[in-house]
Amino acid sequence: MKQIGTAIAMYAQDYDEVMPRIWIDLDGSGGLAGGDMTWRSAILPYVKSAQIFQCPSKKMTTTPFDGRADDYGYQAGYAMNTVHSPVNAPDPPGGSPLADLAVPASTIVVLDYSGGEWIDYASNVHGFINSDSAVTRHSDGCNYQFADGHVKWYKKTAITCSNSECWWSNQESG
């Protein structure tokens, strides 16, 4: 997962300090379809191997990621937090500028997940993802990659999201 964070940082360096989009609607369908690019497609040139998107602690359950959205990569892999890359933003790059991340050391970008390419925070009633989205395949916890590049294991109940602090969102500094 650390390599994914490094790849996202390298991508941002090449694209004016902007994080990769969750998804780029190449066919104009308005929905994720075969041939569209996802965040994994965007950073693939920086990791050189699609196997990096597979958590080594979980066996592959679907076809390997080939850079197209219709595969959804590995269902036992990693997902990106959509707070930092709105799905409805204009096409490339459309992600959040790094300068907009007020507290990078406590802002989650990628995590262990088994439900597809990304986690849709908009579907949560509070407007942010809750800890139920994380897959706890590592000793009842989950690995989280933060915007500053570090990766840390936490029990899913340790990830805070309240009115004053939310590791899933771009919070105010200070």
Where are the regions that the model predicts?
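Short, well-structured segments within or immediately adjacent to enzyme catalytic domains
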Residues: 1-174
